[in-house]
């Protein structure tokens, strides 16, 4: 699966490919040398994997291929969340010092393999729909995973998820945004936020996978309150 965007950076669509890559090679040293913000953004994307797959399963929804989330996908998605809780903060600390470690190795596996299997086979829900909706704003300079982290905060608030406080604390400790202010959108107008809600609802499959149903008006309120 590939994600396509318009020239202006706004979300276009998911492109379903005929086959997966034959091989994925990830050099730990390359990841360790990359800007830390990129890896942290990857954590934000991975963090949503479990909660979106869980929502998709509860809503009897479908993944981007049109199938129901399988057991393996849900196991991988849960392992993704558990790995972040166990290793994410330590991995960021090590990467900030420019060194690799077992925690970094596990984080790379989580961000790339577990999250990839979990989201593609498990399905997406509100967190990604919001992240895609935010791309209509030229002033939103957040990386994809950062926008997903914000979307996840909104999703978990909507669902009244018991993990809400744990997820917010994790995001604060690693530096992932969970509020409009942290996204650099603290001054966003009501009209622009309504446009984000409109764009969010255009992600019809993702919205159908959200177990806690929401209106556009409620979504605007939740984004303001996040």
Positions of predicted regions on the chain:
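Generic structural signal for hydrophobic core residues of well-folded globular domains
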Residues: 50, 54, 137, 155-159, ...
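Active-site segments that bind and position negatively charged phosphate/pyrophosphate groups
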Residues: 61-174
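Short, motif-level signal for alpha-helix interfacial/capping segments enriched in acidic residues
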Residues: 5-6, 104-110, 193-195
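A short secondary-structure junction motif
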Residues: 50, 54-58, 87, 91, ...
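A glycine/threonine-rich phosphate-anchoring loop and its flanking beta-alpha core
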Residues: 1-72
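C-terminal charged capping/lid subdomain of soluble metabolic enzymes
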Residues: 161-226
């Amino acid at each position: 699966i590939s994600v396509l965007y318009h020239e202006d950076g706004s979300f276009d669509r998911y492109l379903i490919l005929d086959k997966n890559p034959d091989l994925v090679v990830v050099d730990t040293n390359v990841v360790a040398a990359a800007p830390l913000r990129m890896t942290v953004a990857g954590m934000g994307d991975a963090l949503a994997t479990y909660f979106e797959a869980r929502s998709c399963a509860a809503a009897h929804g479908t993944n981007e291929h049109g199938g129901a989330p399988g057991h393996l996908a849900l196991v991988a998605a849960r392992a993704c969340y558990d790995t972040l809780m166990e290793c994410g903060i330590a991995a960021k600390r090590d990467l900030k010092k420019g060194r690799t470690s077992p925690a970094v190795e596990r984080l790379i596996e989580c961000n790339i393999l577990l999250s990839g299997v979990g989201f593609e086979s498990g399905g997406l829900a509100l967190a990604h729909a919001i992240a895609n909706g935010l791309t209509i704003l030229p002033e939103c300079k957040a990386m994809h995973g950062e926008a997903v982290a914000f979307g996840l905060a909104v999703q978990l608030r909507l669902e009244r998820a018991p993990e809400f406080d744990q997820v917010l604390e994790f995001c604060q400790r690693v530096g992932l945004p969970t509020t409009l202010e942290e996204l650099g959108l603290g001054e966003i107008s009501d009209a622009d936020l309504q446009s984000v809600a409109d764009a969010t609802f255009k992600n019809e499959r993702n919205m159908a996978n959200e177990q806690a149903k929401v209106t556009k008006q409620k979504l605007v309120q939740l984004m303001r309150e996040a």
